[in-house]
Amino acid sequence: MVQCLDGVRQLLAVVFKCCDLELKQPRGLEDPQVLARETVFSVSEVEALYELFKKISSAVIDDGLINKEEFQLALFKTSKKESLFADRVFDLFDTKHNGILGFDEFARALSVFHPSAPLDEKIDFSFQLYDLKQQGYIERQEVKQMVVATLAESGMNLSDEIIESIIDKTFEEADTKHDGRIDKEEWRNLVLRHPSLLKNMTLQYLKDITTTFPSFVFHSQVDDT
């Protein structure tokens, strides 16, 4: 009987300990220390980022997850504006490929946009943005799709002739292997020569995430060089 009671006490101790942990750690928030080790965010930044995540995830459906509509709303302040850029970013954030973002996906993916994120991570992510077919290289049509989409989002209207000229110049410089496509190595070399290609890959206000919650907005702009 004594042994039985001891067993019950041990079981209750475990239950209370688990309940205590759940109370201390918000539902949906992975261990901040784990995320801090796997991203460029500090523990306090991870916790602040979670507050931002909760605001975005409750914009349409308060379920603790971000769907594409909420993502669009956070990006462009409207859920109706179609954007190839936003679609690509969402798809790359959605590593589980289930059409929704949990906080772990949100934090890990957003880490690449932090000013302190390694350059190689930014280059790799930007390459994936253009690699629409996920073939490991960028084709001419993919570049055109992104250029046209970026121009439209920026409110700029260029003739097809000028757009084709821009793409011609891009491939003339980037496609050093002359095979009609841009691979990761060629993309990296192009970006290193033209760092402005990565200007959309850095969100300066992520440095101040612990003190303020700025609008989560990517400003898609055309390279002005």
From Swiss-Prot:
Output a single Gene Ontology CC term carried by this record.
vacuole
- Tell me which species this is from: Oryza sativa subsp. japonica
Q: Which SMART domains match?
A: EFh (SM00054)
* Tissues showing expression: Expressed in roots, shoots, culms, young spikelets and scutellum.
Q: Which residues form the EF-hand domain?
A: 45-80, 81-116, 118-153, 162-197
Known partners and oligomeric status = Homodimer.
Matching entries from PROSITE patterns are given as: EF_HAND_2
InterPro entries, sorted: CNBL1-10 (IPR045198), EF-hand-dom_pair (IPR011992), EF_hand_dom (IPR002048)
Q: What is this protein called?
A: Calcineurin B-like protein 2
Stimuli inducing this protein? By gibberellin.
